């Protein structure tokens, strides 16, 4: 069953910009929080993880690209992974480079 966000994340007002993703518990480095974007042919779809994470020059998360295949076509998806230990209550951030593809 698809869940828009893992149970340990929430969306709330950000000091960075608008709304952001925040932790409800400590997250350890390397934690895969799920899919943030998917690209099928030339169209990019953003999940709530990709839509609410804010930019930072020194982020605590990164995108990990995965090439997927099925019987009809290949597609790419990106998962959001913690690059540092993140404390409860902290905002998740990412370096915005996705649309430089």
What are these regions (language model features)?
Residues 1-101:
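Conserved catalytic SET/PR domain of SAM-dependent protein methyltransferases, capturing the structural core
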């Amino acid at each position: 069953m698809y869940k828009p966000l893992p149970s340990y994340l929430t969306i709330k007002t950000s000091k960075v910009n608008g709304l952001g993703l925040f932790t409800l518990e400590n997250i350890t480095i390397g934690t895969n929080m799920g899919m943030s974007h998917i690209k099928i042919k030339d169209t990019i779809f953003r999940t709530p993880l990709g839509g609410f994470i804010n930019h930072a020059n020194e982020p605590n998360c990164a995108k990990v690209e995965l090439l997927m295949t099925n019987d009809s076509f290949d597609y790419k998806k990106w998962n959001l992974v913690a690059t540092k230990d993140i404390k409860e209550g902290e905002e998740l951030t990412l370096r915005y480079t996705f649309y430089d593809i």
